[in-house]
């Protein structure tokens, strides 16, 4: 239902104007040349939700994120059950498996159609999409939110746009909840 824009569209697709249960649906993915129809089972999580839950499982009682656990266990194993996911986070997840790499040194290059790119060009929104649990676990502690989100972001992204975007999103979550409960 994420692509339905009005109740008429819901009625046409599902026979009902209000959705109260999960439905299996199909989505075209993969682009023009290598596209395919992905069957999304009722109740399935998106890649963003999967990684958000991975981050949540990595948070200690005191609000700190076990970044090594997230990187070497959650992120590395995510590839076995990932639903979708962008190129940036998938490559980072593959590269974090190297024994010589730590959560704070996941530096890599990768080939694309246009040449060779490196982690510093990884500026997508994958980091921002998973940081909600960090902000919620540290409400009211902006410095801790910034630090934990920065550390979590650099595991998969090297471009300042991705890192600062995730930090700004975490700050916004904190401020909205603190000042508009």
Predicted regions and their residues:
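Structured, active/binding-site neighborhoods that engage oxygen-rich ligands
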Residues: 1-181
């Amino acid at each position: 239902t994420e692509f339905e824009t009005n109740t008429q569209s819901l009625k046409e697709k599902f026979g009902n104007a209000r959705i109260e249960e999960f439905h299996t649906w199909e989505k075209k993915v993969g682009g023009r040349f290598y596209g395919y129809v992905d069957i999304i089972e009722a109740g399935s999580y998106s890649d963003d939700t999967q990684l958000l839950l991975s981050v949540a499982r990595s948070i200690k009682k005191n609000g700190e994120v076990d970044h090594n656990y997230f990187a070497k266990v959650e992120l590395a194993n995510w590839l076995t059950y990932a639903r979708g996911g962008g190129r940036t986070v998938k490559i980072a997840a593959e590269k974090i498996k190297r024994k010589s790499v730590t959560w704070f040194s996941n530096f890599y290059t990768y080939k694309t159609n246009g040449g060779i790119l490196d982690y510093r060009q990884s500026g997508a929104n994958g980091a921002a999409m998973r940081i909600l649990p960090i902000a919620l676990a540290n409400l009211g502690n902006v410095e801790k939110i910034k630090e934990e989100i920065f550390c979590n972001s650099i595991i998969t992204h090297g471009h300042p746009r991705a890192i600062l975007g995730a930090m700004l999103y975490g700050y916004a979550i904190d401020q909205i909840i603190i000042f508009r409960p």
